[in-house]
């Protein structure tokens, strides 16, 4: 029955489900109801499962504890006697022993445990003093708010407060740096905005800046006075207006020169005259006013008649039927600025300022606003940043609306053709007097040059036709090649030597093929053997064989060369004239196999001559791998017994697995050899509880994927080889320089 209880508890706690299996739980309750010993055994099994480092196992075990706590007095007594350990394993009262992963399941179990303890206190608190003490301990000492849904302890609150305080300090430092940066860059941003605005005004001036008439009444009165100046009755009004203007000018202006010259001869407007009249004119008598009114009335009637006549004459002269014409003009709203020689500099400055705003200042202002918003500061810095952002947006929008069409800037790169053109400029320069580019033959040796090929007897000059057409050298290059002190002369000499050596070698190599075809055939069929001095001088006298120079004095210059003596050595002569020929014998291939039994049940197929690197000395075996000789069988049995005796008794995989289940400590049972054949047993042991969350499995995050690629064995080897090559090149380059060697 105890075995049945253990199996039920293990199945229920390792299911990995959020809710227990009702049938299994009912069967467990039925067994516990039969005897108190079973309850005691179940209690120890559940406490063992609560000590497991897996939150899903603890949650299932806690659910079983809740079911049995409500139905058994003995189980309540056993649990309350060890209530402190129970709270540490479920409520996390000891912050040094946090709940195991997965984190979500652990948090769920903690909330459920606190609610359950509160229910137990309300139901059984009066009967069990330790339960009441545990409840007050959680409430008063651990500061657990049982009404709080999150059920945070005092340690959790303290951690949250420290985290929040740390974040606030970080944001304060960032805001301080951003404010200082904004103060430094604000002047530059305003300067760029002002520069863009000035460029906009230069490219598209405002029409209001060029308005001549500021009032429609002035424009209408000016248009009306123009035709009246042509009438015959204008002389009378002109004299009156001139007198009137003269009097007003004396009153309103101290000096007539202050009045603009373009407005001196214009007739004064009635509205302007009345508005600029002085106090002396206002004091005129009523009689003068009435006479002026009558005169003005007569002048007005005459001017109206003249205006009508001039209007009809204007229509007749211009071929117009009437003034009642309506013109509809279609004005294109699409704006486009084309680049020309007049606005190139302005556009360049505008584009530079636009690039600076868009690529540097715009991202900086956005980051400032984002930082100030996250920090929650409603200071002047945030308002200033928002205003600057609006100004930048307006400038960028205006630049986009202008639709600027700029020419593509082509960057001119100096090429070899440009250098040739520069060299061609010097071709027409006359040579200096007395300069002889040709070096005589008797002076060529003094300059380090070979004698000319044309003067050597018995040699015919060969005419070489290059495959690639060469560029005709310039006069400057020819002069450099003829000057023996220049590097060009040395290069030309080396090229000439190589050109002479190549045709000669090819010609000599081609002669045997045409002249001695039989010799070539014999050489191809002849065997090749290593050649020594004895074969090299076969059948010839070797005068220097076995002779050595003996120096009576080891000094470099005290003894003359004639004093050197030759000594014959018989040993050296014997070595030169002796030849050793090895006769290894006939090769016999290996026909036997190792045939030692393998762990997978097969036999070793290695064909070594004397010793197998895996199974030792090769001995004759039968078809199933058992040694034929009795001595070999006894030796293998003795070695196997000694190997088993070296292993410790407690390292039994099954015993280690049971200890790990009871204590929750990994003793390394998975690394021990498993009894049985094949790989199925090991696979089943690894997946003993497939429903539980695998804690060793890494989360599939971007960091883990990058780590898998970066720390891959092949990648690491490639990086190491590249670094070694770089160090090797650096060492080869600066090996003899102590300054670089110490770095």
From Swiss-Prot:
A zinc finger (UVSSA-type) spans 591-618. Residues 226-252 have a biased composition (Low complexity). InterPro entries: ENTH_VHS, UVSSA, UVSSA_C, UVSSA_N_a-solenoid_rpt. Residues 2-145 are annotated as: VHS-like. Residues 147-199, 380-411 form a coiled coil. It is found in: Chromosome. Belongs to the UVSSA family. Factor involved in transcription-coupled nucleotide excision repair (TC-NER), a mechanism that rapidly removes RNA polymerase II-blocking lesions from the transcribed strand of active genes. Acts as a key adapter that promotes recruitment of factors involved in TC-NER. Facilitates the ubiquitination of the elongating form of RNA polymerase II (RNA pol IIo) at DNA damage sites, thereby promoting RNA pol IIo backtracking and access by the TC-NER machinery to lesion sites. This is UV-stimulated scaffold protein A. It comes from Xenopus tropicalis (Western clawed frog). The lineage of its organism: Eukaryota, Metazoa, Chordata, Craniata, Vertebrata. The gene is uvssa.
């Amino acid at each position: 029955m105890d075995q049945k209880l253990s199996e039920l508890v293990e199945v229920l706690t390792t299911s990995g489900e959020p809710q227990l299996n009702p049938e299994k739980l009912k069967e467990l309750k039925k067994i516990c109801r039969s005897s108190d010993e079973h309850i005691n055994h179940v209690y120890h099994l559940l406490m063992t499962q609560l000590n497991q480092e897996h939150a899903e196992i603890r949650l299932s075990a806690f659910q079983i504890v809740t079911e049995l706590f409500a139905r058994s007095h003995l189980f309540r007594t056993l649990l309350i006697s060890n209530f402190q350990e129970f709270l540490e394993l479920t409520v996390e009262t000891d912050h040094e022993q946090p709940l195991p992963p997965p984190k979500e399941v652990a948090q769920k179990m903690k909330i459920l445990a606190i609610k359950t303890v509160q229910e137990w206190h309300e139901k059984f608190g009066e009967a069990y003093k330790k339960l009441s003490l545990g409840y007050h301990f959680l409430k008063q000492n651990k500061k657990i708010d049982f009404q709080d849904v999150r059920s945070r302890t005092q340690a959790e609150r303290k951690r949250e407060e420290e985290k929040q305080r740390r974040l606030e300090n970080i944001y304060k430092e960032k805001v301080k740096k951003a404010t200082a940066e904004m103060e430094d860059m604000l002047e530059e941003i305003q300067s760029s905005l002002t520069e863009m605005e000035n460029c906009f005004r230069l490219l598209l001036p405002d029409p209001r800046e060029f308005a001549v008439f500021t009032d429609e009444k002035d424009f209408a009165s000016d248009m009306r006075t123009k035709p009246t100046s042509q009438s015959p009755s204008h002389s009378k009004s002109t004299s009156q207006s001139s007198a009137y203007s003269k009097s007003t000018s004396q009153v309103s202006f101290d000096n007539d020169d202050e009045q603009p010259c373009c407005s001196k001869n214009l007739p004064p407007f009635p509205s302007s005259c009345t508005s600029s009249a002085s106090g002396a004119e206002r004091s005129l008598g009523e009689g003068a006013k009435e006479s002026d009114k009558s005169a003005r009335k007569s002048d007005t009637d005459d001017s109206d008649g003249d205006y009508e006549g001039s209007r009809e004459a204007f229509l007749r002269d211009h071929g117009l039927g009437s003034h009642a014409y309506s013109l509809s003009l279609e004005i294109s709203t699409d704006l486009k600025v084309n680049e020309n020689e007049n606005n190139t500099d302005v556009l360049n400055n505008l584009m530079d300022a636009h690039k600076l705003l868009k690529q540097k200042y715009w991202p900086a202002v956005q980051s400032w606003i984002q930082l100030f918003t996250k920090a929650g500061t409603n200071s002047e810095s945030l308002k200033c940043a928002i205003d600057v952002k609006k100004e930048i947006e307006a400038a960028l929008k205006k630049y986009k609306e202008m639709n600027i069409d700029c020419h593509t800037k082509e960057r001119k790169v100096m090429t070899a053709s440009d250098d040739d053109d520069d060299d061609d400029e010097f071709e027409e320069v006359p040579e200096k007097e007395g300069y002889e580019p040709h070096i005589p033959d008797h002076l060529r040796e003094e300059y380090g040059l070979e004698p000319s090929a044309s003067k050597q007897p018995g040699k015919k000059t060969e005419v070489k036709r290059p495959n690639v057409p060469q560029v005709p050298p310039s006069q400057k290059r020819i002069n450099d090649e003829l000057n023996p002190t220049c590097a060009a002369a040395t290069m030309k000499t080396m090229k000439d030597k190589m050109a002479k050596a190549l045709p000669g070698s090819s010609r000599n190599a081609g002669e045997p093929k045409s002249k001695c075809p039989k010799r070539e055939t014999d050489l191809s069929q002849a065997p090749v053997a290593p050649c020594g001095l004895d074969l090299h001088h076969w059948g010839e006298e070797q005068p220097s064989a076995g002779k050595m120079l003996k120096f009576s004095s080891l000094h470099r210059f005290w003894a003359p060369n004639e004093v050197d003596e030759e000594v014959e050595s018989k040993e050296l002569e014997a070595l030169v004239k002796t030849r050793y020929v090895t006769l290894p014998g006939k090769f016999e291939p290996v026909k036997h196999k190792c045939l030692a039994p393998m762990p997978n049940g097969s036999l070793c197929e290695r064909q070594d001559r004397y010793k197998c690197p895996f199974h030792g000395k090769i001995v004759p075996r039968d078809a199933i791998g058992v040694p034929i000789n009795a001595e070999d069988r006894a030796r293998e049995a003795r070695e196997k017994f000694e190997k088993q005796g070296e292993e410790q008794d407690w390292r039994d995989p099954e015993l280690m697995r049971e200890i790990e289940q009871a204590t929750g400590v990994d003793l390394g049972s998975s690394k021990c050899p498993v009894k049985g054949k094949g790989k199925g047993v090991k696979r089943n042991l690894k997946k003993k509880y497939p429903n539980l969350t695998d804690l060793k499995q890494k989360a599939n995050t971007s960091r883990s994927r990058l780590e898998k690629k970066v720390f891959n064995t092949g990648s690491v080897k490639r990086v190491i080889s590249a670094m070694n090559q770089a160090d090797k090149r650096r060492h080869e380059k600066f090996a003899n320089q102590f300054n670089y060697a110490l770095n």
